Curated annotation (Swiss-Prot):
Signal peptide per UniProt: 1-21
Subunit relationships: Monomer.
Glycosylated residue positions: 91, 100
Function: Seed storage. This carbohydrate-binding lectin has toxic effects on bean bruchid pests.
Protein's recorded name: Arcelin-5B
Disulphide bridges, residue numbers: 167-203
Keywords on record: Disulfide bond, Glycoprotein, Lectin, Plant defense, Seed storage protein, Signal, Storage protein, Toxin
Domain of life: Eukaryota
Pfam families named in the record: Lectin_legB
UniProt record similarity statement: Belongs to the leguminous lectin family.
Organism expressing this protein natively: Phaseolus vulgaris (Kidney bean)
Length: 261
């Protein structure tokens, strides 16, 4: 028995050392500046107010038709390392504003995509997908704040959601909105909590996601929205703040530690 515990302890220490070699990431943007570690694509810019303005506006401040912009953290994020899978937590605040409160398009995605991936199709594809059919090579997982269908979607490798929950973006148009997204790798649990801060209305949704099967070892994390094809359906997408942290926890090492104890 003693020798078995010693062997488990030795294996635990080896795995712990390996876990510590994985890259964990943490950053915080209480507001945004042009020299921040961000990759801006399409129509994305940093506004004079320190906001991440993801889709275009006209000279008078109205949302621009058929606009798409993407913003990703410039350093790749490690999601998996051998038996190790990262958990993560991200918080951000956004405002989506449309001219027509009864209908708008298309929404904002928070996405984990392939490193150095170029922008994809506009409109309902949100700049992260190319087709309505499964794309195994897309290696993308996204939480979509779907303003066209008034819901929160979970998308894996194509635009059709495998989980969704109603959330009335039209009713709370223009409100500052706080979001927390968490992923717990110990039970493959992806959760979204959304709070319209003026109306005090909340939405939430969760699902089981085996992230290590859906994305690459290293990913880029960030935002990708698109606006509608007519002036009546366009909207602006501004992110006011964003923080992110990832942490590795080795499932096998936890089992060995329980055996030692």
């Amino acid at each position: 028995m003693a020798s078995s515990k010693l062997l488990s302890l030795a294996l635990f220490l080896v795995l712990l050392t390996h876990a510590n070699s994985a890259t964990e990431t943490s950053f915080n943007f209480p507001n945004f500046h042009t020299d921040d570690k961000l990759i801006l694509q399409g129509d994305a810019t940093i506004s004079s107010k320190g906001q991440l303005r993801l889709t275009g506006v006209t000279p008078n401040g109205d949302p621009r038709v058929d606009s798409m912009g993407r913003a990703f953290y410039s350093d790749p994020i490690q999601i998996k390392d051998s038996n190790n899978v990262a958990s993560f937590n991200t918080n951000f605040t956004f405002i989506i504003r449309t001219k027509n409160q009864s209908i708008s398009a298309y929404g904002l995605a928070f996405a984990l995509v392939r490193v150095n991936s170029p922008p994809q199709k506009k409109q309902e594809f949100l700049g992260i997908f190319n087709t309505n059919n499964p794309e195994p090579n897309a290696r993308t997982v996204a939480v979509v704040f779907n303003t066209f269908k008034n819901r929160i979607d979970f998308d894996k490798n194509f635009i059709k959601p495998y989980v969704n929950e109603n959330c009335d973006f039209h009713k709370y148009n223009g409100e500052k909105t706080d979001v927390q997204i968490t992923y717990d790798s110990s039970n493959n649990d992806l959760r979204v909590f959304l709070h319209f801060t003026v109306s005090q209305v909340k939405c939430s949704v969760s699902a089981t996601v085996h992230l290590e099967k859906e994305v690459d070892e290293w990913v880029s994390v960030g935002f990708s929205p698109t606006s509608g094809l007519t002036e009546d359906t366009t909207e602006t997408h501004d992110v006011l703040s964003w923080s992110f942290s990832s942490k590795f926890r080795n499932k096998l090492s936890n089992i060995l530690l329980n055996n030692i104890l």
